[in-house]
Amino acid sequence: MPVDAQVLLAHVLGVGRAWLIAHATDPLPRDRADAFFALAKRRREGEPVAYLTGRREFHGLDLDVSPAVLVPRPETEGLVECALERLPAGRPLAVVDLGTGSGAIALAIASERPLARVLATDVSHEALAVARGNATRLGLVNVTFAQGDWYGALPADAGPFDLVAANPPYIAAGDSHLDDGDLRFEPTRALTPGGDGLDALRAIVAGAPARLLAGGWLVVEHGYDQSDTVRTLFAEAGFETIEARRDLAGIPRTVAGRKPGQAEIRVRPPPAMPESST
């Protein structure tokens, strides 16, 4: 049975996938079979499994998701790891996650750095409701939330921050990928800012130095073909120690940069990433 089908059947039955394997020959009640086939039909039409089940695992956290938020992706776990390398444990740090969506990045950081104060923002009230619900269910009390567009969401007394993280919309308007597969069902505003896809990244990079402590870090996710441009934006904004990372598929996916000044935090060496011609 394909993985998606296993996940949907486990969801319908309220059991784990291991239970399914152990009971593979058990008869399926008619009402559960009908529910499964209804979900399977929606999946064949392209609807994401995470929307059908209402759940997605991310960095070891079981998150609620809905069509109000982007489905958290494995590639974004690389951004979280990059951020954690710049946030030493055991220190009372200040972090902001811009455009939090389901809260995946903010909650992953908060769970790994319990002494950090993490602020999660989003322009969407519906997305913030999902993120707040996840924080409550996971018992993460070191996360707060604010509504608004990028830095416009920050309360007057917020910051300066040790680290700014963001996985903003970065797909160009008219990109054919927006009409493919799962993306057709996800919120357009979370996927593309319009134009060449870089407007949100431009705003986030340009505004970061004023919100960061000296020696603080900005870490962003970007599109598969945007690494060089994003690194240029970092350099133009005055960042140093600019580092590009590849995701597990070898595709350039994350850029981090340090605000000049006396370092407030130390970075442990990142793991070596294989080169790729992709």
Region locations from a protein language model:
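Conserved AdoMet
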Residues: 7-85
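Conserved beta-strand segments of alpha/beta enzyme cores
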Residues: 62, 117, 142-144, 240-243
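C-terminal lobe and adjacent flexible extensions of AdoMet/dcAdoMet transferase-like proteins
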Residues: 254-278
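Mobile active-site "lid"/loop adjacent to the S-adenosyl-L-methionine
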Residues: 159, 169-200
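Class I S-adenosylmethionine-dependent transferase superfamily signal
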Residues: 83, 109, 182, 204-208
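Residue-level signal for inorganic ion chemistry
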Residues: 8, 46, 76, 105, ...
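Conserved SAM/SAH cofactor-binding pocket of Class I
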Residues: 74-177
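Conserved Class I SAM-dependent methyltransferase catalytic core
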Residues: 195-258
